[in-house]
């Protein structure tokens, strides 16, 4: 969208003197060449401004690229990304299933196994404690026999 605004000079222009016919033609040619240079600059600016859309999104720009890439190349790129995304999706699905299987197996087999190992260790500790108590009782019993024998 182009907006036109009028710019007024701050300088007050005085009445221009009358020129002769030749001077007027020379002035017109000079101003025409100056205007052409200015018009060329304005044209290049206006071309850019005409093509620029402030409301254009990234998606609009990507869709516009469709015209640049040939259909055969687009199909090749689409197939490649389709295959890659399918491969990655399947890999994550399979790895997730494997992780779930291993975790469930570890819980179903590992927890009871660890509990039975812990119970076995407690049983071994209790046997050691009973053996130490019986050895202590035997030593005390032998000491009492020796004390009773010396007393008689």
Swiss-Prot record:
Signal peptide interval: none
Membrane topology note: Single-pass type II membrane protein
Q: Name one GO cellular component term.
A: mitochondrial outer membrane
Q: Which UniProt keywords apply?
A: Membrane, Mitochondrion, Mitochondrion outer membrane, Phosphoprotein, Protein transport, Receptor, Translocation, Transmembrane, Transmembrane helix, Transport
Residue ranges in the Cytoplasmic topological domain are 2-97
Residue list for modification Phosphoserine? 44, 46
GO biological process per UniProt: protein import into mitochondrial matrix; protein insertion into mitochondrial outer membrane
Question: Bias regions of kind Acidic residues — which residues?
Answer: 37-49
UniProt free text on domains? Its cytoplasmic domain associates with the cytoplasmic domains of TOM20 and TOM70. Its intermembrane space domain provides a trans binding site for presequences and the single membrane anchor is required for a stable interaction between the GIP complex proteins.
Q: What does this protein do?
A: Central component of the TOM (translocase of outer membrane) receptor complex responsible for the recognition and translocation of cytosolically synthesized mitochondrial preproteins. Together with TOM20 and TOM70 functions as the transit peptide receptor at the surface of the mitochondrion outer membrane and facilitates the movement of preproteins into the TOM40 translocation pore. Docks TOM20 and TOM70 for interaction with the general TOM40 import pore (GIP) complex. May regulate the TOM machinery organization, stability and channel gating.
Q: Which protein family is it in?
A: Belongs to the Tom22 family.
- Quaternary structure per UniProt? Forms part of the preprotein translocase complex of the outer mitochondrial membrane (TOM complex) which consists of at least 7 different proteins (TOM5, TOM6, TOM7, TOM20, TOM22, TOM40 and TOM70). Interacts with TOM20 and TOM70. Interacts with FCJ1.
Task: List the protein's name.
Answer: Mitochondrial import receptor subunit TOM22
